[in-house]
């Protein structure tokens, strides 16, 4: 029977996410994008709604209680994740290329033609890779043990200091009780008459049940795989960088300065700006044909990083003099938020150590106990805490991507989110990143809160099919370590080099 309350929640939550997305665009968008660029804005709203829905479906799956709530969650999960794949691979790239295309460029044809070219290249690469991997590795190998029977042992014929005894019948293996002692049992042996206090479970050797997964499920696996690669890098970086920068921004907040100091700093910024203008002209002249060499692309990324840091320095200078240091309460709120973020990051890292890495026999349930206790006290409390913890991971991914782009700017250009100064291509880039990593974050949370999600359809989807695919199953063994190791390396790196510095551009 369908649970009416769950239907209401399933409708209300996406509606709230849409409203939050509208506010996010209005708060962050650049003035040049006001009342224009409606198509990219619609894609941003739909993408954020889809990503948030995919994460918040996990509590809905828990409340559905193995299907008793009336929702076909196994089908809904596949629909949502296929939609995520379409948005991340096709729609967001198309909208981004469409926004960035220059109609004045005769080589681009039109905005739509330019967008189709870039999108087709991404779609072709993803489709080709998916087909090749599906043909060779689209088979799940489920470990199984064939149980022949469970019998009562009439006697325990060996002494406590002997761990292994072999009898006749070598084709039958047995496990006694809860111990891992393997013996051979001969039911015809008269020495086994006894009190019947022990049990023997007859088993064959471990076997693997093989079946080819559906192409839809394999596409979800591909998105999850790429999402995990991004989550390991950006999520691990963001877990440290987010609280680190929030606290560091308070320490380095703009201070009130006199007029002469303002003129001195403004002059230095002007000199940097003049130098960057000349560098920009040089880069533009070398790429007038629309094609960048590897070196030119690296220089372009360095150029964008230097421009961003220059703009940041100028904004801080204006706050220091024209606004007399700005609103102090904002920086104290950020300072407090930094310590809250630090606590959440430490909580996640501790949970990885004592619960996820030590599975299947974890040292302590930790966050599971918190969510379950709150869920038992009042269902929405558990959902709220889960939502806050999971969305925090999304913020860490966005922060990690930005931090990675600032420090390793030669790999790809940065797409910062700045209040009142964010172009739609930055929105689209970050929405695509959020969509891809939302799948891996849901998978991560399914394992992190496995006691909370044990009867869910998504747990069966990930644990049965996705985690047991050929070759890829070995990746799932190490990715939890990857997140933790990346966080530790980031902490070491940021303590050694805490400040972001402009790159040296070699033109």
Curated annotation (Swiss-Prot):
<protein>
    <recommendedName>
        <fullName>LIMR family protein DDB_G0283707</fullName>
    </recommendedName>
</protein>
<feature type="transmembrane region" description="Helical">
    <location>
        <begin position="75"/>
        <end position="95"/>
    </location>
</feature>
<feature type="transmembrane region" description="Helical">
    <location>
        <begin position="427"/>
        <end position="447"/>
    </location>
</feature>
<dbReference type="GO" id="GO:0016020">
    <property type="term" value="C:membrane"/>
</dbReference>
<feature type="transmembrane region" description="Helical">
    <location>
        <begin position="42"/>
        <end position="62"/>
    </location>
</feature>
<keyword id="KW-0472">Membrane</keyword>
<feature type="transmembrane region" description="Helical">
    <location>
        <begin position="215"/>
        <end position="235"/>
    </location>
</feature>
<feature type="transmembrane region" description="Helical">
    <location>
        <begin position="476"/>
        <end position="496"/>
    </location>
</feature>
<dbReference type="Pfam" id="PF04791">
    <property type="entry name" value="LMBR1"/>
</dbReference>
<keyword id="KW-0812">Transmembrane</keyword>
<feature type="transmembrane region" description="Helical">
    <location>
        <begin position="5"/>
        <end position="25"/>
    </location>
</feature>
<dbReference type="InterPro" id="IPR006876">
    <property type="entry name" value="LMBR1-like_membr_prot"/>
</dbReference>
<feature type="transmembrane region" description="Helical">
    <location>
        <begin position="378"/>
        <end position="398"/>
    </location>
</feature>
<feature type="transmembrane region" description="Helical">
    <location>
        <begin position="120"/>
        <end position="140"/>
    </location>
</feature>
<comment type="similarity">
    <text>Belongs to the LIMR family.</text>
</comment>
<feature type="transmembrane region" description="Helical">
    <location>
        <begin position="335"/>
        <end position="355"/>
    </location>
</feature>
<keyword id="KW-1133">Transmembrane helix</keyword>
């Amino acid at each position: 029977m369908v649970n009416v309350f769950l239907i209401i929640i399933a409708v209300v939550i996406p509606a709230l996410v849409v409203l939050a997305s509208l506010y996010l665009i209005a708060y962050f968008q650049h003035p040049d994008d006001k009342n224009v660029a409606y198509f990219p804005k619609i894609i941003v709203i739909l993408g954020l709604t889809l990503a948030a829905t995919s994460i918040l479906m996990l509590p809905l799956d828990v409340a559905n209680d193995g299907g008793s709530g009336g929702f076909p969650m196994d089908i809904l999960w596949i629909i949502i994740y296929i939609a995520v794949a379409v948005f991340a691979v096709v729609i967001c790239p198309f909208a981004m290329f469409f926004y960035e295309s220059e109609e004045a460029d005769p080589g681009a044809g039109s905005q739509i033609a330019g967008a189709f070219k870039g999108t087709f290249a991404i779609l072709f690469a993803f489709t080709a890779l998916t087909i090749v991997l599906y043909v060779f590795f689209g088979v799940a190998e489920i470990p199984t043990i064939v149980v022949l029977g469970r019998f009562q042992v009439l006697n325990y014929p060996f002494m406590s200091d002997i761990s292994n005894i072999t009898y006749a019948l070598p084709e039958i293996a047995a496990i006694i009780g809860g111990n891992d002692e393997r013996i051979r049992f001969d039911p015809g042996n008269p020495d086994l008459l006894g009190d019947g206090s022990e049990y023997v479970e007859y088993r064959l050797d471990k076997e693997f049940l093989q079946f080819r997964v559906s192409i839809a499920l394999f596409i979800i696996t591909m998105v999850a795989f790429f999402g995990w690669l991004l989550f390991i890098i950006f999520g691990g970086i963001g877990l440290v960088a987010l609280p680190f920068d929030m606290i560091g921004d308070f320490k380095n907040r703009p201070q009130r300065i006199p007029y002469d100091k303002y003129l001195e700093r403004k002059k230095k910024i002007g000199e940097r700006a003049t130098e960057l203008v000349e560098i920009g002209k040089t880069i533009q002249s070398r790429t007038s044909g629309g094609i960048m060499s590897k070196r030119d692309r690296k220089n372009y990324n360095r150029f964008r990083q230097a421009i961003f840091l220059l703009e940041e320095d100028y904004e801080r200078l204006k706050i220091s003099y024209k606004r007399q240091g700005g609103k102090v309460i904002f920086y104290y709120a950020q300072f407090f938020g930094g310590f809250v973020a630090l606590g959440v990051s430490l909580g996640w890292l501790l949970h990885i150590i004592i619960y996820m890495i030590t599975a299947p026999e974890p040292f302590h349930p930790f966050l599971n106990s918190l969510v379950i206790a709150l869920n038992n006290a009042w269902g929405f409390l558990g959902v709220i805490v889960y939502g806050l913890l999971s969305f925090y991971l999304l913020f860490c991914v966005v922060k990690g991507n930005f931090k990675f782009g600032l420090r390793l700017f030669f790999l790809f250009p940065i797409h910062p989110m700045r209040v009142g100064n964010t172009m739609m291509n930055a929105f689209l880039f970050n929405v695509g990143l959020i969509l891809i990593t939302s799948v891996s974050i849901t998978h991560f949370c399914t394992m992190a809160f496995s006691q909370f999600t044990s009867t869910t359809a998504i747990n069966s989807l990930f644990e049965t099919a996705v985690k047991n695919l050929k070759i890829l199953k070995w990746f799932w063994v190490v990715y939890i370590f990857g997140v933790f190791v990346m966080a530790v390396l980031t902490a070491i790196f940021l303590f050694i080099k805490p400040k972001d510095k402009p790159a040296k551009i070699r033109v």
